[in-house]
């Protein structure tokens, strides 16, 4: 007898002897546990009943179209069962309404039903539940499905297991591989997860999909028939499955298919218990197997009750499954890591670097097989993947959804999808330089519209699909049409790395580039026509911020913005020096960054000279190193245009203040750089400029050396004179400027923006009224003069939730969608649902009065209001009415919320 029970601190000595004390205390704990378990069971059963009735009432079926001709569903039942959504009569009605006399059902579960329900077109496969199917059966079912689809273009296959997850998914994935849609398991699994989430494929399932790929490869692999001897199994480190979490008591089972042929399980006392200190588990087997082999290891447990009943329980540690025909002939050791093992569901029970090792040996002679495998003498080269679809567009969309590029676009390497494995898919027999791309440009080129012919596109070999109805292996093996180019192209010199820096002299036809950021901003502010495309005889700048876009997308790789604008040193024209603080000779004195967005004046811009130089060497050592990034927000010369903001620069003849030569004018560096000097004067003027305003008074920065000034100011250079200009001078006559050091011209940071009409007592109200208007359109005065509105029209959904609602509204019943919007954020919250029920009731309902949250504080109030709501929306009162189904859905939501309210103890609101 264990002494721990007698010495337990919760036992009182007044209860008597040790045995009766233990029985009494144990009985109390037993009934307490029984009460808790019974309560949880009833709660779970009640919730499952409600969910089942809800789903049945709403007409939901567990029914998924993986393709238009492959359907997956869960098990159909003849009777109502808890937790099952598919009733056989509903499924038959649905299939007969859409695919009458053109569907066949494949039952993969060991459970059966009356096949007459589906017009006796049911194939019983009886696959095991927690294992992968045998390779023989998997291949045979795929071949049967293909033959059925081949008979009539309207035929469809309906696949189901118990839950419509793992077994159904491996069959559909194998069917994709069988029809040459995919040549690797990865895209097939991704497509299955996209179409039916939560399929739960185990590593053994994926392994068998790989076997199907080997059987259906260009050079198909044929499994051998040599028996395999498993000498021993080694597990390291020792997993933690006992109560102390320091070891386990393992035994091993070996199965061929579903038949157990060997086990090491013995009497509990005779079995060895392994501890963490042992380091590994070693179990000798010496069993010979052939075909589909399953190796499972269990932990044997024994409790006091099981000892009295002479029973033991077990917990599965892991399971692995493989086919002996795919093991290489010289293999002696098979290693499986934790991601390659099945049934490893509790990660904390497995130490790091957990692995299983099988010591094996292949026999030299083949075993005579009773049945010929279905893959023998079966040619799959004529199998067309288009048989899985009803249209070519569906075929293309499925390839994209599975993570593989469509057949008319060069795909990535399937082994390293999405990681730039592009050059491995090129057909090097066709030496066209137009098909040489940078890896970083591949993703951008795929998304652009291409003007190439089909023959040019076929020069990029695709390992997965076929095009234009050719044979399915035309994509795997290049045909004559792929090897012979449509028209020989002259050899061209391509600078892949951009080391030479010179533009290609030959002009190529390139697809129209989408508008860049600078073009969009240029059109927005009225200066879109300033820049034109770079001619073929000139050296253009391949800048992503340039309005004309890159010069070519096929002949030369696209340079990044960093390589064109952020060079460490800049080459300046001959004899020219660069002063970053001096004013340039352009007509607009403050156009520091506008030259990056205007190509019309690029010939005289010292900033663009280094990017046009074919040599990366520096020719002006006296030039300081400047790092300039193109600014897509616009130039600084927006004040020179009478219409407001302008992106491009004007010529020297349009401004009386600019110089006509290209040499930069040097000026003294200003002593004060105060960009906030005019912040206090923004309240009294509008940003919209007037056409009749004199030069420099258009609501912006005045040009340098403006004729409006009486004399040059010693402290008003470059930035400060334009930045400190008083904006309110646009409303008064021009005045001669005073020296910058005078107190009248200094910036005032204490201005309170009190330019409001009315007296001192009325200003608070006026400010409150104007605040809302300013928030509604803060920049309306800027854009109103240019023909734009400050209010952005909402033409589409702006959030993910709105986009999801928009998609649901296309397919879902409007009444159901309204119910979902009602319960959003209020799931099973009885108070929230009752207080908002008036928003979801049907038209014409006048009995229900809106209830506030203040009337739902106590449980009694909630109960009273809930009963009133039930009387209003009860389905029995809506029998025969057009809103009967709608009332039933409202009633179900209220019923679920009330059940949750009762389960939580009917707590008051506060």
Swiss-Prot record:
- What does UniProt give as GO cellular component? clathrin-coated vesicle; intracellular membrane-bounded organelle; postsynaptic density; presynapse; vesicle
Q: Name one Pfam family in it.
A: PTEN_C2
Source domain of life is Eukaryota
Major localisation: cytoplasm
Which keywords does this chain's UniProt record carry? Chaperone, Cytoplasmic vesicle, Hydrolase, Phosphoprotein, Protein phosphatase, Repeat, SH3-binding
Q: Where is the composition biased (Polar residues)?
A: 596-626, 732-758
Changing residue 876 to A has the effect of: Loss of interaction with HSPA8
Instruction: PTM Phosphoserine: list the residues.
Output: 109, 450, 453, 560, 567
What name does the UniProt record give this protein?
A: Auxilin
Q: Which organism is it from?
A: Bos taurus (Bovine)
The gene name on file is DNAJC6
